[in-house]
From Swiss-Prot:
Gene Ontology, cellular component aspect: cytoplasm
Record carries keyword Magnesium: no
Any one GO biological process: L-histidine biosynthetic process
Nucleus listed as a keyword: no
Highest taxon of source: Bacteria
CDD domains: IGPD (cd07914)
Compartment(s) where it occurs, according to its Swiss-Prot or TrEMBL record: Cytoplasm
Record-given protein name: Imidazoleglycerol-phosphate dehydratase
EC number, as in UniProt: 4.2.1.19
Catalytic activity: D-erythro-1-(imidazol-4-yl)glycerol 3-phosphate = 3-(imidazol-4-yl)-2-oxopropyl phosphate + H2O
Organism, as annotated: Bifidobacterium longum (strain NCC 2705)
Gene (name only): hisB
Length: 199
């Protein structure tokens, strides 16, 4: 059975059209109308091996927040949909990724219980403007939106870093690598990887 999803979300603030394939090769076609976010979501697709197509636009003349948030919401929903009954998945995964002086660690549990903990960001990171339009605070917001709408537990920890661009990119790549292994089918797993029998 194909582990894919296609979701279109239309509100007065944004239009999001997103497709993904969990069993892809990391092919991406990303246009969110927010250049730095394009860069981050392209990295997420590439390093998770999730084929990802996103065409999004919104009221970015006001602020990029709505488009960024809504894209993350739809990505989370699509991830949940594509996972289906979660039979055979590895479920747990972690990844630590460097980018020059920055180092980020992501730990994922595809548990069906949404939770997100972000820690370790340097003081003032949330106020930094990255790429001209994207604030550091949006990184945490993206992680929370993905986790809660995908129904996963995500711990994201910044272990080192000075450059806000490097920190953000390390976080997205760490999430990508953790998702790559968490969603992967393990041929040794029989059924749902839970003692309860459901996730």
């Amino acid at each position: 059975m194909a582990r894919t999803a296609h979701i279109v979300r239309e509100t007065s603030e944004s239009h999001i059209d997103l497709e993904l394939n969990l069993d892809g090769t990391g092919k991406t076609d990303i246009d969110t109308s927010v250049p730095f976010y394009n860069h981050m979501m392209t990295a997420l697709g590439k390093h998770s091996l999730i084929d990802l197509t996103i065409h999004a636009h919104g009221d970015t003349d006001i602020d990029v927040h709505h488009t960024v948030e809504d894209t993350a919401i739809v990505f989370g929903e699509a991830l949940k949909q594509a996972l289906g009954d979660k039979k055979g998945i590895r479920r747990f995964a972690d990844a630590t990724v460097p980018l020059d002086e920055a180092l980020a660690k992501a730990v994922v549990d595809i548990s069906g219980r949404p939770y997100c903990v972000c820690s370790g960001e340097p003081e003032g990171y949330e106020f930094c403007m990255i790429g001209g339009h994207f604030t550091g605070s949006l990184v945490r917001h993206v992680m929370e939106s993905i986790a809660f709408h995908a129904g996963i537990c995500l711990h994201m920890q910044v272990l080192a870093g000075r450059d806000p661009h490097h920190i953000a990119e390390a976080e997205f790549k760490a999430l990508a690598r953790a998702l790559r292994f968490a969603v992967e089918i393990d041929p040794r797993v029989d059924g749902v990887p839970s003692t309860k029998g459901a996730l």
